[in-house]
Amino acid sequence: MARLPEDPMVRNIVQMIRGAQLNRRQLLRGAAVGAAAAGTLGLASCAGGSGGGGGDSIIWGNWTYYLDFDEEEGINPTLERFNEMADFTVQYVEDIDDNNTFYGKIKDALELDQFTGYDTITMTDWMNTRLIEAGQLQEFDYANMPNVENNLLESEWEALGSDPGRKFSIPWQLPTTGWAWNSEAFPEGLHTLDDLMNPKLKGKVQVLSEMRDTIGLILSGQGVDPAGDWGDAEFDTAMEWLETAIDSGQINNVKGNDYTQDLETGTMLAGFVWYGDVVMMNTDLGDQWGVEIPEFGGMIARDSFTVPNGTTAENKARVEELIDYYYQPEIAAEVAAYVAYVTPVQGAQEAMAQVDPSQVDNPAIFPTETDWEHLRQFRTLTPEEDNRYSTAFQRVLGL
């Protein structure tokens, strides 16, 4: 049987998660919540001590809206094909809401080198740096991943300062952060930070609980390069803008990956978003939302595969087989056509001509040189800065 975390609390959480896998749209829209809760409790109460799937499986923890999905069939097509051809199966769970809350769930297991409940996870690289520096991740064997070695974009090999050569992290997607607005309410769109302060939006604006995305976008809107040489003064100015907007009631929502629910229901009319999520919402619901990477600059990050120390050697090799599968350009193109984020796989743009010709020149997936000029990375923080800035951010958000 598959292993569960040694920590009893984490083990119970994992058992409940695996016992109640819902359609992703239900999760994001908050549908059937009552039934889900009842089902979760019922299944958890009768779960066996070992729980989970069989021994011939691995568990991949990811974000929502982050893998191609067939609504009618209720499957992830690329993953379904992989499971059919591999001699093991991948249990795919959309458990990452934001980096800090997910890290809090697995922190104890990581520190003890115990199984976390996941054989591979795809957190953001700034968080992966924390795990790398703590010695909590296993080094990849590129002999098992020829596609990665051949097809990872050249710029990505050295993109993470704490992991030159990508020994411990392999990019999954490069998410971009911008903002969105209800097109019916604001047909002219929103293009500056001041636009978000429109009195018509009072109580209807939301921001993301990821500090680097929210503060990065504010810094950029205030004329500061988030990747540049800024410090406490610039951070404090950005925080002052955010605190004023929250205290006045203009911003009324701070969420992680479940923020899309409030956009879909109309509870929120505008806010900071992960670009691809809104592209998918418009695909599902009709073009109800305008979305843009602001002219002054939006944010870009990297979510990367990692393998925690508690994963067995056998399952680490299986994870490497899975990653290598997704580094085939045609598979990467199929995923990118759905998630609408920048793909790190060379050749995916050429492969997209066969997968979905309408997406070949989609700048959300394949940014041009001009597009890259409008994307900003958040600079690497020292541990002391990270702690101090994160504490200040959490305080203002009331988290």
Region annotations inferred by a language model:
Residues 178-185, 220-223, 301-316, 334-338:
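A bilobed periplasmic-binding-protein/Venus flytrap-type ligand-binding module shared by bacterial periplasmic
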